[in-house]
Amino acid sequence: MWSGDRRVGMESLSPERLHGHPYQEEASVFCRLTVKILEARSLPRADLLSQADPYVTVQLPTASGMKFKTQTVTNSSHPVWNETFSFLIQSQVKNILELTIYDEDVITKDDICFKVSYDVSEILPGQLLQKTFSLNPQGPEELDVELLMERTWDPPENLITNNVLVARELSHLDVSLDRAGNTAMAAGQDKLELELMLKGSYEDTQTFFPDTAFTFSFHYMRGQDTELNGYLRGPRNSGWNSDTSVTPFNVPLMSLAAGKEMTIDIPAMKAPEGKLQLKTDCCPKELSVRLSYGLCPEEQAFLSRRKKVVAAALKQALQLDEDLNEDEVPVVGINAEGGGMRAMISLYGHLLALQKLGLLDCVTYFSGISGSTWTMAHLYRDPEWSQRDLEGPISHAREHVAKTLLKEFLPEHLASYRQTLKLREEQGYTVTVADLWGLVLESKLHGQVTDQKLSGQRAALERGQNPLPLYLSLNVKENHLETLHFKEWVEFSPYEVGFLKYGGFVPSELFGSEFFMGRLMKRLPESQICFLEGIWSNLFSVNLMDIWYDITYGKDSNNFPVDVRNSEKEFSGSAGTSSGVEAPWLESGTALAQALKGFLTGRPFHQRSANFLHGLQLHRDYCNQRHFSTWADCNLDDTPNQLTPQDPQLCLIDAGCFMNSSCPSLFRPGRQVDLIISFNYNQSLPFKGLQQSEKYSRARGLPFPRVEPSPEDHSQPQECYLFSDPTCPEAPVVLHFPLVNDSFRDHSAPGVRRSPDELKAGQVNLTGAASPYFMYNMTYKNEDFDRLLQLSDYNVQNNQGTILQALRTVLKRRASETRPLGVKT
C-alpha cells in the first residue's frame, strides 16, 4: 500500500538503441463483438442427489482484461441464460473467445465442467451467427451461443507488428486524490484503504490510504473496453465495516476524453466524500522491444568488422595469394554442447588448439549451452582474450576446479550469498534457487562474486577482435507441462536477448526489467552475469516428466520429438474442450489429478524473470508466418491465449534439458553460417546432439547435411567427422569432434608417439565406472584436468588437415555461388 506520488512513467532508451526496428506500422479498424449466451443442454449431474448449478464465464483477453459471468442457474441440466456481453476487438490480432462452464459450489472451489475456445475471425462483419458447441465429443452436452460482429466508428488504431507479434497503442490513466476541504475524517475511518483495479493494465491493482493525497498511473491498451473499479475498505482488524466494501464504484474508460480531466466522488459511509481526479492520455508509440527476425544493427556492424579479421586469418591459414572481398568471407560458427565441468575443461582445450593452429580468428560465432557457457563467460571478461595466450584463463580454471564444492557452503560464503540476494531482491528481482546456484558457481569458478555484466562483453567485439558469443536457454511452462511439450529458444548475446520464435528482442542490459506492450515500464539494474549462468547451466530445473522422457528416449535420437507442424494449417483451436495440451491421464479436473500433475511437472528450482514480451498480442496470421513454426507435439502453439506474451514472467531453464546443442542460434536468418565446428561433450552418445540438430533443422525446412554414423562409429567413434551435402550448397558443412580418446593414447602430439614412460598420460578414462568426468562432478584433480584438456587440444590439432579441407570447401562455395537471402529458420 502506498501514499504520495506513485506515477509509473515509461522509461525511454537512448536514440541509438531505438534504431533498426524493421517492423511494419499499419492502421487497423475496430469491430464490436456481441456474445449472447443462450442455453446449455444435457449437462452432467454434480452429484447423486442433485443436478449441476451452472454458470458461464466469458473472456476475450485481447479485448479486455475482465472476465464476465452469467447468473447461476440452480439444479439444472438444461440451463437457460440469454445474457449478452460486448467486446471492442482489434481485427488484426488473433482474438480467441473463451467460454467456460462452471458448477457453482458453496463449500469448495467451483468445478470446471467444460471449456470452449473459438476464433472469432470466422464471423464476418454484419453477420449474426448462432453457434452450437459440442462440449463433449463422446457425449450429448452442448452450448448454444449467438455471435454478432459489427464495424464501429471508433478511430482506427496504429499497430506495430512483425506479422507475428503486435504492439498496440498504449494509454495512461493518471489518478489523484483531491482532499481540498476534506482534511478531517470521521473517527475510526482514518485507516481506510482505497483499492483501485484496472484489469488488463500493467499495474492491475493498486491500494492506497485515502487520508493523504496521492497520485499514480495505470497503463492500458487504448482500445481496451474496460473500466476502473474502486473499493473503499476498512482494515480487517478494525470494527469499521471490516467485512465488506463500501459502495464499490466504477468508471468506464471509454467515457474519458483524452487529455481532459474528470472528477468523481468516492462514496464513504459516515465520512466526507473525497474526490478522485482522472485524466487519460496517449503514451509514446516508440517501442523498447525490437520486433524483427533479422539481426540487430549492432550485430550487422560487428559482422563487417569481424570479416576483416577472418579474411586475414584465412589468407594466412590457407596460404591464399589474394585478399578476400567481404562477400567472399565464409562464416564459421562454433557449436559447443553442454556437459558440466567436463564441457568447460574440454572447450578450453579445443579453443587452445584452434589458437595454436591460427584458426581461432576464422570463427565468427561462438555459441554454447550449459557447462560450455562457463568457459565463454570467463573468457569474455577479457576484451582481448582470443589475442592472448589462453594458458592464463586455463590456469585460473585449473586452480578453482581443484577446490571442493563444499567449501562454497561455508558460513562466511552463505552470509555473502544472502547479502547479495537480499540486494538483488531490493533492486526488484524475484530471487530463486537458480540465483543462489549462480552465486555458488561464481564463487567456485572464480573465488569471488564479480560485477561482470553481459552487456560488458561488447568491449570484446568493438574491433571485431573476437567471435560473437551466443548463449542459449529455454523458456518453458512453470508447472503444468513437461519440457518436450512446450519449449522456446531464448538467445542471449552482448547486444540483445530475445525469442527466436517470436522475433522479439531487447537490449541485453534490459533483460529482467519490466515491460508492457513493448514499452519499458520499470528499469532494473542489469543482472550480474553469474545470475545468467545460473539460468544457462541449471540442470536442476528439469521436472520428473523430463527425467522420464530422458530415460525412455535418451539413447535413441530417432525418437527425439522435434517434428514441426505444417505452418499453413488452419488454427486448430476453433472449438473444443479445454486446451488439449495435456496427456490424457492428466486431463481430469479432480484435485487428485491436479496434485499429481503438479508433482510430476513442477519445477522447484527454475529461474523467474520479468517477461519482456508481456502484453504483446499475436497477429491474426501468426501461424502462417514462415519464421513461426509450431511443434508437432505441442498444441499450445495453436492456442495464443496461452503463449508466452500472456505470461508476466518467464520460466527459463538449461537448454540441455531438451536438446544438447546450441545450433538453433546458428540457424537464425542473416547469419548464414557456412561451417559449423561442433564440439561434443557427451560421454556415451557422441552424435546425439548433432543428430537432434539435424532433425530439428529438417523439420523446419532448413538445409542441413545428413548425419548418419555407422554402428561402428557409435561404438568406437573417430576423432573428427566431416558432414556435407554436395547437392545442396545452402547446407552448412559440419565438422564434428566427439569426446573420444583414440590416437591420443599413444601419441603425445600429432605425429609424435609416446615413449613407454608417457603411455600412462594417454590413459583418459572417459566412460568407465571410476571415471572422474561424470556429469555432476564439480571437483577435478589437476592431473584429471590436464589429461582432459590435453586430449581435447590434441584431437583438434591432429585433424588440422580436415579442418583446412572444410575451410577450403566453404571458401570455394562463397566465391562461386550467391547465397539466397531470407533463409527460413
From Swiss-Prot:
It is found in: Cytoplasm, Cytosol; Membrane. Residues 281-825 form the PLA2c domain. Weakly or not expressed in most tissues. Detected in placenta of 17.5 dpc embryos. It is an enzyme of class 3 (hydrolase). Its EC number is 3.1.1.4. Pfam families: C2, cPLA2_C2, PLA2_B. Pathway: Lipid metabolism; fatty acid metabolism. Substrate binds at G339, G340. Its cofactor is Ca(2+). The active site is at S370, D654. It catalyses: a 1,2-diacyl-sn-glycero-3-phosphocholine + H2O = a 1-acyl-sn-glycero-3-phosphocholine + a fatty acid + H(+); 1-hexadecanoyl-2-(5Z,8Z,11Z,14Z-eicosatetraenoyl)-sn-glycero-3-phosphocholine + H2O = 1-hexadecanoyl-sn-glycero-3-phosphocholine + (5Z,8Z,11Z,14Z)-eicosatetraenoate + H(+); 1-hexadecanoyl-2-(9Z,12Z-octadecadienoyl)-sn-glycero-3-phosphocholine + H2O = (9Z,12Z)-octadecadienoate + 1-hexadecanoyl-sn-glycero-3-phosphocholine + H(+); 1-hexadecanoyl-2-(9Z-octadecenoyl)-sn-glycero-3-phosphocholine + H2O = 1-hexadecanoyl-sn-glycero-3-phosphocholine + (9Z)-octadecenoate + H(+). The keyword Membrane applies. GO terms for biological process: fatty acid metabolic process; glycerophospholipid catabolic process. GO terms for molecular function: calcium ion binding; calcium-dependent phospholipase A2 activity; phospholipase A2 activity. Stimulated by cytosolic Ca(2+). Signal peptide: none annotated. Residues 14-133 form the C2 domain. The keyword Ribosomal protein does not apply. One of its GO terms (cellular component) is cytoplasm. Gene3D superfamilies: C2 domain, Cytosolic phospholipase A2 catalytic domain. Calcium-dependent phospholipase A2 that selectively hydrolyzes glycerophospholipids in the sn-2 position. Compared to its human ortholog, may have no preference for the fatty acid found at the sn-2 position. The N-terminal C2 domain mediates the association with lipid membranes upon calcium binding. An additional second C2 domain may stand in between the C2 domain and the PLA2c domain. This is Cytosolic phospholipase A2 delta. The lineage of its organism: Eukaryota, Metazoa, Chordata, Craniata, Vertebrata.
